[in-house]
Amino acid sequence: MKEITVPIQYLIETPVSALYTNTTSGFDTPRQQTAGRVQVVKIVYIAAPTSNSVGVGATTRSSAKQYETKMFFENVDYLGDGDDQANATSFQTPDGQEYFVQPISYTGQDVKVRCSCLDFYYRFSVWNNNDGSLLGDPPDPYVKKTDSPPINPKRIPGLCKHLIALTDRLRQERFLR
């Protein structure tokens, strides 16, 4: 039987902080600065305590256009009624149920992300898929039609300005710490 080896980078996702740093240090475009002009209009939390995961969906707005921006966290520690909730973070699902979880680590917690904007689709989705941090189905293979330079020459996973804005908001709300 032939042994198959898979590089470790394809077996685990990437922490939010690494995607954020890749984006802010790897590109000339100041996404972090333009993210400040993105409005996070609505956040919806989807709790999945039986699978120890949380989905965060947001409607974001920039330049009068709306985008669906999503993050998915696994290995989340949900707290029960008897657990110490003093240092916990909480969120409410659309049905009004409140959940308490250990704060999600900004630097250590792996994440899967997706945004409906074209910048994310063309610049990051392929590379996020390669490292396991893309939420949902991978994009169709890109067929280059011009001689222009690649949009992501370093081939690094990252975040669009809408995902940066959502990350900043989740940190402000202390959901990410």
What is the predicted role of each segment?
Residues 1-177:
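Long, low-complexity, compositionally biased intrinsically disordered regions
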